[in-house]
Amino acid sequence: MQERHTEQDYRALLIADTPIIDVRAPVEFEQGAMPAAINLPLMNNDERAAVGTCYKQQGSDAALALGHKLVAGEIRQQRMDAWRAACLQNPQGILCCARGGQRSHIVQRWLHEAGIDYPLVEGGYKALRQTAIQATIELAQKPIVLIGGCTGCGKTLLVQQQPNGVDLEGLARHRGSAFGRTLQPQLSQASFENLLAAEMLKTDARQELRLWVLEDESRMIGSNHLPECLRERMTQAAIAVVEDPFEIRLERLNEEYFLRMHHDFIHAYGDEQGWQEYCEYLHHGLSAIKRRLGLQRYNELATRLDAALTTQLATGSTDGHLAWLVPLLEEYYDPMYRYQLEKKAEKVVFRGEWAEVAEWVKAQ
């Protein structure tokens, strides 16, 4: 039997993106999992619930016996086939259950009996989760430079191009605004935090990291919130503000929110449904800020959005969207960001166009 991993190996597992065969039930996996994990459960949700009830009422021996009864015969063979295939596909991987207890040991023993020696995480997901939390707390203590600027200034791209940059919006699968959702569903809060910790560990391990470059985010990115330890450090960080011309910002927003999102929806759903999903996405974004816009202004912009979509469907041109996007920026997004920036003006250490800020960041 291969040697099992202990505490000293947990960070190395996250840094290396070690494949993890997570044998917890799907409901546990959905609540929180490690980035490189695949869910091949020993018991499904119903089986786990039945065993849990049995444990409370009759004790551990009866629960164990019920578990073996439920996962037997053809069911056991199907799951063994899946574990065997995953082990062969991921020879450097590792088994994981909730706490490194009976479930991962049972699967490990069954695999051993089938001729496959495969290690497990001693301490299970709980140990990896605690490692991720502690790593984030420690790494967040390094200095931080935030990239700020109005919508469309290319902040995310600038962060992505820095070797010490961490794309918080990319990890959260959300661009942080009313129109920020992507076609990928957001992760659970715990899974997002685990992914963030792994990304910070990998970035830190690649270089002698002196500071982090992050986008100036609010506490919430869609449905995910930043870990409090990182958020607290970000409120104290220096800010470099990108101030690009309005026309350049419009070009970026056209590319990102109209051309790219239209392409992505069509690619994912096909022409007809993809178009409907794209229209719904834009209307949902505008509707999300209806109360702040006021009903009259919202209705005006929604009418312009409908006209722009009609033109885009007929001609392929996205130019019509400027009729509602420009006033949305001028009357809502830009004033809101400038107001937020005024409250932390003393933290602004540099201002310039995109290339100037990128050059300044590299010099830090």
UniProtKB/Swiss-Prot annotation:
Protein origin, superkingdom: Bacteria
Enzyme kind, highest EC tier: transferase
InterPro entries on file: P-loop_NTPase, Rhodanese-like_dom, Rhodanese-like_dom_sf, SelU
Gene3D superfamilies: Rhodanese-like domain
Single Gene Ontology MF annotation: transferase activity, transferring alkyl or aryl (other than methyl) groups
Protein's GO biological process: tRNA wobble uridine modification
Catalytic activity: 5-methylaminomethyl-2-thiouridine(34) in tRNA + selenophosphate + (2E)-geranyl diphosphate + H2O + H(+) = 5-methylaminomethyl-2-selenouridine(34) in tRNA + (2E)-thiogeraniol + phosphate + diphosphate; 5-methylaminomethyl-2-thiouridine(34) in tRNA + (2E)-geranyl diphosphate = 5-methylaminomethyl-S-(2E)-geranyl-thiouridine(34) in tRNA + diphosphate; 5-methylaminomethyl-S-(2E)-geranyl-thiouridine(34) in tRNA + selenophosphate + H(+) = 5-methylaminomethyl-2-(Se-phospho)selenouridine(34) in tRNA + (2E)-thiogeraniol; 5-methylaminomethyl-2-(Se-phospho)selenouridine(34) in tRNA + H2O = 5-methylaminomethyl-2-selenouridine(34) in tRNA + phosphate
PANTHER family recorded: TRNA 2-SELENOURIDINE SYNTHASE
Protein name per Swiss-Prot or TrEMBL: tRNA 2-selenouridine synthase
Annotated gene: selU
